[in-house]
Amino acid sequence: WGQAPDGSRYLAKRQEIGEIPAGWNVPVLMYHAVGDEIWGYSDLFVSAAGMEAQLQYLQENGYETIWFSDLSHIEEYEKPVILTFDDGYDDNYTVLYPLLEQYQVKATIFVIGNAMGSPHKMTREQVYELAASGLVSIQSHTYTHGNLSAMDEAALRQEMELSNAALAAATGQIPYVLCYPEGKYSYLTMDIAKEYYSFALRMDGWTYQTGMDPYQVPRSFVSRRITLPDFLWFVNPSGKTN
């Protein structure tokens, strides 16, 4: 069960994922913070103007932003792209969310289960609002953002179960996508993840092609230094392969 900010309770549900057609190129882009106030590693912060320019490019050039659940009907999209944001920073709500609304763009945000409400992170109420917006899919970045490659089975299960419980309580949806913290995972991590999720994401690689291992989905890192010409390389190719 989850509880909304107004105190009402609801039954959390898991997203059902159908069979995914093979042979489609789907760029998966990896972001973190969005904004001009830099308080940490600068490459993690894409400027507000840079983010808007990228969204504008996608819109003007016929790209369609999708969620991972949309992959089961990928044939409906000519130029699909998935935007992902790691860690659940508060600027995802204050800076990114207004841009998503302005351009009607979908995004997936990976929230750390025990970090909601901590400094520089979104509050539970903000996570709830984003999840209810129709533009944002809230997914798992584990419970503590620990090193999954160093954990045994019991610790891995605890990370995933506590994360899922926290996010289900906040959003009413049980996560179906896992983002490996810092891209660290092992064969054991993947084996356990298959029991809880339909997809799991890396922090490196290039374009994801449907039919690849869904527990090693590659992503392109969009840093603050990325120019618009660089960005074009990240989103091509997109669509049906030959």
Regions found by a protein language model. Name each.
Residues T94-V95, Y103, G134:
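Acidic/His-rich structured neighborhood in mature extracellular/periplasmic domains
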Residues R14-T84, Y89-D91, E129, S133, ...:
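C-terminal active-site subregion of NodB/CE4 polysaccharide deacetylases
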Residues L83, V111-M116, H145-D152:
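Surface-exposed cleft-lining segments at the edges of enzyme active sites
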Residues Q104-R124, E129:
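A short, conserved beta-to-alpha structural element at the edge of catalytic cores
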Residues A33, S137-H145:
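Histidine-centered catalytic micro-motifs
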Residues G2-I20:
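Boundary regions of SH3-family modules and the immediately adjacent low-complexity/disordered segments
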